[in-house]
Amino acid sequence: MSKTKYTENTSDNTMLVEREFNGTVEQVWRAWTESDLLAEWWAPEPFKAITKTMDFREGGHWHYYMLGPDGSKFWCMLHYLQIKNLEWFTGKDSFADENGNDNTDLPGMHWKNTFTSGGAGTIVTVLVTFSSKEDMQKITEMGFKEGFAMAHDNLDKLLKEMK
């Protein structure tokens, strides 16, 4: 099992996230773009990702929350901007409320997720762009790296089940 690699660039407020998964591009793409599969891996344990609405298309969105073991809900919204099927998609991600309104008290970010065949499976490269160095630092302090790596471990388990 591969480990998630993070490269921060404070000169352009980006974080490059790379991970290889043992699955085909089609399997990994589905896991990132279908709500029933996202529910199986997106949230770091012991949280669960619960989709309220999802419309994976340019101009669509994914409105979801992470449900904590104590019943707490952390709402998020991902607006899909551009999609090249089975290759990449971009989106604007933000914390939100249950109605889908952005929570401007917490930093948002722009994602470009790229899927390529390589090695034993599929390499996913995520370029996360922040509005400022301070926003990148705040998200990092909130546990982004640890949480995303845990979610990636969940995805590894899901891909084994999909074989």
Feature-to-residue mapping (PLM):
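Solvent-exposed residues in well-ordered beta-strands and their adjoining turns
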Residues: E20-T24, L67, I83, T116-G118, ...
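Hydrophobic-ligand binding "helix-grip"
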Residues: P44-K48, K52-E58, L67-G119
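Short, solvent-exposed aromatic-acidic interface loops
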Residues: S94-N99, L127-E134
